[in-house]
């Protein structure tokens, strides 16, 4: 009986070794947690806020309060998965040139009783060698 279990020992050792690897080990093509302060994460977040304001039908701009969570994935470039909090500002969207991110971030917030906060999930795909960055998914509530 002991003799029949020997072929299982090799794969069992491999499985045990894999289970002992740190959970943060990077898997090619897999999602990796990222620091919300990383410059490329900040750039993706700025782009997401800019696009949210361009695409939304809201009469006022929303600014970034904070990045709650960031992950990235290597997929012919980098795809960023961001969870962010946005807050409605007192800056109205007017006809003409839209505000850029830094201008939006300088907009004042309404009084506490009138504040509207959103939690948004964004996917941003960056391909810097092509000079392209796209918002591929957006949902806010």
UniProtKB/Swiss-Prot annotation:
Disulfide bonds join 91-107, 120-140. The keyword Secreted applies. The keyword Signal applies. Expressed at a low level by the venom gland (at protein level). Pfam families: Cystatin. Gene3D superfamilies: 3.10.450.10. PROSITE patterns: CYSTATIN. GO terms for molecular function: cysteine-type endopeptidase inhibitor activity. GO terms for cellular component: extracellular exosome. It is found in: Secreted. Transmembrane segments: none annotated. Its main location: secreted. Residues 1-26 form the signal peptide. It comes from the Eukaryota. A motif (Secondary area of contact) lies at residues 73-77. Coiled coil: none annotated. Keywords: Disulfide bond, Protease inhibitor, Secreted, Signal, Thiol protease inhibitor. Residues 29-129 form the Cystatin domain. InterPro entries: Cystatin_dom, Cystatin_sf, Prot_inh_cystat_CS. Negative results: the recombinant protein does not inhibit calpain-1 (CAPN1), a C2 family cysteine protease and legumain (LGMN), a C13 family cysteine protease. Does not provoke cell death (PC3 prostrate cancer cells). Belongs to the cystatin family. PANTHER family: CYSTATIN-M. Inhibits various C1 cysteine proteases including cathepsin L, papain and cathepsin B. This protein has no toxic activity and its function in the venom is unknown. It may play a role as a housekeeping or regulatory protein. This is Cystatin. It comes from Pseudechis australis (Mulga snake).
């Amino acid at each position: 009986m002991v003799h029949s279990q020997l072929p299982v020992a090799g794969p069992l050792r491999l499985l045990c070794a894999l289970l002992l690897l740190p959970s943060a080990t990077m898997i090619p093509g897999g999602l990796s947690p990222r620091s919300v302060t990383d410059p490329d994460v900040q750039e993706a977040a700025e782009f997401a806020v800019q696009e949210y304001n361009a695409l939304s039908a809201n009469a006022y701009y929303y600014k970034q309060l904070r990045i709650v969570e960031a992950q990235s994935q290597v997929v012919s470039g980098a795809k960023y998965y961001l969870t962010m909090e946005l807050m409605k500002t007192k800056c109205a969207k007017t006809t003409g040139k839209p505000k850029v991110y830094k201008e939006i971030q300088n907009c004042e917030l309404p009084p506490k009783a009138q504040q509207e906060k959103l939690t948004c999930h964004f996917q941003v795909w960056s391909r810097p060698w092509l000079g392209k960055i796209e918002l591929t998914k957006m949902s806010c509530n």
